[in-house]
Amino acid sequence: MSNEYNKQTIYAADFETTVYKGQNRTDVWSACMGKLFSDDPLTIDHSIDDFFERVFSLPGNLVIYFHNLKFDGSFILDWLLNNPKFKLAADPVDDDEQELAISWKKNKGMYENTYKYAISDRGMWYTITMKQNRRFIEFRDSLKLIPFKLSEVADAFKTEHKKLDMKYEGFRYPGCRITEQEEEYIKNDVYVLKEALEIMISDGHDKLTIGSCCYAEYKEICGKSFYYLFTDQYRVNIPCEKYGSNTAGDYVHASYKGGWCYLVKGKEEKIFEKGLTADVNSLYPSMMSSESGNRYPVGNPTFWKGNYLSENALKNNRYYFIRIKTRFYLKPGYLPFIQIKGSHLYTPTECLESSDVYDRASGEKGAFYTGLDGKIHDTRVELTLTCTDYELFREHYYVYDFEILDGCYYETRIGLFDDYIEKYKKIKLESKGAKRTLAKLYLNNLYGKFASNTDSSFKVAYLKNDALAFYPVDEHLKRPGYIP
């Protein structure tokens, strides 16, 4: 267990909230808590006011986990926003483009009776942190650490307690009587979470997310070589007027794509029977292992400029990224996969069959269109692609007016992740229950942290018509992963 947790008392908690026909507000009528690594009985409070009274009576720094903080945390934030005693731990930011921009105070800079929270611009809830009575109370989302439904947690970790099913009957409200059956159900949920968290934390898996746990362990395995192999690409400056980006990280990130999901045209809204579903077991670790033969980029890139593909980029121990400008048309018998984001001319989620666009002046779709300025523009688009996607692009599409603008290449290595993967592969094969589940989590969640960028944009909560509302703040202060 890390030193951080030695200084804190950890709890698992859960709210039950009102659900009834015709309701116009939702309240907490049960708040259950259990202390980790302790045989102390669980406690149940009958309102959110009673819950905070209990929390404030506990000594020392506290970490309190809820399984899905986005739900339970909304009641906590609502309570804080409606309590004038507690103020936001933030400073205004002088930003002409964001009138209400703020920056969160660090823990050491927080004043008494203040709070802050981490909610991403995409609505992902991570923490709510309070400073009260000269100590910190942090509410965390255990769903980010243990990414399963609570019913699945019980099965995966083989906990002694199992999640029960129960439908509440009758009207519930803060302070209402709780039956013995309801109390058993409420406590059981917390016991399941408590047991799973004890397993995770006892094994040292105590970061905010499972991805962070994986990344931290991999860094420990690599030692000092990690910082040589995986340099911060956002600190590798390049001339924007020459390469279209300010840093190597920005340049490479433009090539980053999510998974491919496509419905073949003509097959929508039809029923097909006797279909086939295919899956690849442990796809990420199998591709990261040296057994796959895959080589991965390391270090800093070498750039080239001009309408050619550098011979150095094509060597066996290299991986390259390329920026091109072209018009394109899908070849017969091939599936589309190119998406163009950030342009009003294209739907960002559509896999395009061509770069042609609709021209309002002519009423037709073609290679040229009339802009708002009244001038004729061509539809040559700029794309940044990995060498893997570039080769696939040339295979799937015809190209016209094609031009290579520039590119960069990296040295590559094989077996970078073998020590990490072999460790958890062995545990997975030789273990059952919680240890096997943990091994699967660690095998499948390392990759994502390497893809993170500097975007740390977040949401700020406020009350609107007696309900929570949010506005976004743009920020780019997060430490990035190694995107290549």
What are these regions (language model features)?
Residues 1-4, 15:
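Replication-associated primase and helicase/ATPase modules
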Residues 4-6, 26-30, 36-68, 74-484:
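Conserved acidic
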